[in-house]
UniProtKB/Swiss-Prot annotation:
GO terms for biological process: translation. The gene is rpsO. Belongs to the universal ribosomal protein uS15 family. It comes from Mycoplasmoides gallisepticum (strain R(low / passage 15 / clone 2)) (Mycoplasma gallisepticum). Transmembrane segments: none annotated. Part of the 30S ribosomal subunit. Forms a bridge to the 50S subunit in the 70S ribosome, contacting the 23S rRNA. This is Small ribosomal subunit protein uS15. It comes from the Bacteria. Keywords: Ribonucleoprotein, Ribosomal protein, RNA-binding, rRNA-binding. The keyword rRNA-binding applies. PROSITE patterns: RIBOSOMAL_S15. GO terms for molecular function: rRNA binding; structural constituent of ribosome. GO terms for cellular component: cytosolic small ribosomal subunit. Gene3D superfamilies: 6.10.250.3130, S15/NS1, RNA-binding.
Length: 90
């Protein structure tokens, strides 16, 4: 259910701005998006797993807050990230 270390490293390398960048908004949103996809697949199979559902809601909320921050501070970067991750914007 959790992201494997290799997959997380791959996502970080794809979205980081430099070698030391592991915590920028871009990286955090990309990692959260992948975790949300995994949790969604899990919840389709396990409909009564309410603890995982709560975790999903938490991750979606955190990603929403990060995207709102990015939208307010750098609109072009926000649009690029949304299109690259294939997310809908609000």
């Amino acid at each position: 259910m959790a992201l494997s270390k290799d997959k997380k490293t791959e996502i970080i390398k794809k979205f980081q701005k430099n070698d030391a960048d592991v915590g920028s908004v871009f990286v955090q949103v990309a990692v959260l998006t992948e975790e949300i996809k995994l949790l969604t697949e899990h919840l389709l199979k396990n409909k009564k797993d309410f603890i995982s559902k709560r975790g999903l809601y938490t991750k979606v909320s955190k990603r929403k807050n990060l995207l709102n921050y990015l939208k307010q501070n750098d609109l072009n970067a926000y649009r690029n990230l949304i299109s690259e991750l294939e997310l809908r914007h609000s």
